[in-house]
From Swiss-Prot:
<keyword id="KW-0813">Transport</keyword>
<keyword id="KW-0679">Respiratory chain</keyword>
<dbReference type="GO" id="GO:0005743">
    <property type="term" value="C:mitochondrial inner membrane"/>
</dbReference>
<comment type="subunit">
    <text>Complex I is composed of at least 49 different subunits.</text>
</comment>
<keyword id="KW-0472">Membrane</keyword>
<keyword id="KW-0496">Mitochondrion</keyword>
<dbReference type="GO" id="GO:0005829">
    <property type="term" value="C:cytosol"/>
</dbReference>
<comment type="similarity">
    <text>Belongs to the complex I NDUFA12 subunit family.</text>
</comment>
<comment type="function">
    <text>Accessory subunit of the mitochondrial membrane respiratory chain NADH dehydrogenase (Complex I), that is believed not to be involved in catalysis. Complex I functions in the transfer of electrons from NADH to the respiratory chain. The immediate electron acceptor for the enzyme is believed to be ubiquinone.</text>
</comment>
<protein>
    <recommendedName>
        <fullName>Probable NADH dehydrogenase [ubiquinone] 1 alpha subcomplex subunit 12</fullName>
    </recommendedName>
</protein>
<dbReference type="InterPro" id="IPR007763">
    <property type="entry name" value="NDUFA12"/>
</dbReference>
<dbReference type="GO" id="GO:0050897">
    <property type="term" value="F:cobalt ion binding"/>
</dbReference>
<keyword id="KW-0249">Electron transport</keyword>
<dbReference type="GO" id="GO:0005739">
    <property type="term" value="C:mitochondrion"/>
</dbReference>
<dbReference type="GO" id="GO:0045271">
    <property type="term" value="C:respiratory chain complex I"/>
</dbReference>
<keyword id="KW-0999">Mitochondrion inner membrane</keyword>
<dbReference type="Pfam" id="PF05071">
    <property type="entry name" value="NDUFA12"/>
</dbReference>
Amino acid sequence: MALTVAKSALEAIREKGLGGFMRMIREEGFMRCLPDGNLLQTKIHNIGATLVGVDKFGNKYYQKLGDTQYGRHRWVEYASKDRYNASQVPAEWHGWLHFITDHTGDELLSLKPKRYGLEHKENFSGEGDAYIYHSKGHTLNPGQKNWTRYQSWVPTKTQ
């Protein structure tokens, strides 16, 4: 694999020159690969792959049919290089990515424009925008339920 990376790097230097190669490295996000090994693996895996599509969030979807193991030949490169998780993949691309369908997300949107009822939003659990469920009796619940099940007897005053 290292030989493939070195060959493609030398080929890119020959085609674009050293300045163009350095510009490509910066634009494609290879500098961000230094602290993030997952991104580096994705970038190396992208060599020889075809870009299948880009979703509305900027995520790029790739496919490599040659010498790649089945089940590992479709992947996503997230738009956010520093903060990413699987919930950033919209529903229309999820089916293609997990081999449920061979239609890409763009094809699914053209086949059925209103396929999914809600607009996709990533999961913000554990972050500032997270929806936090509070039970009925929780003090932070705005509609806190009064759990008093009885009313104490108050004698009537006679005059």
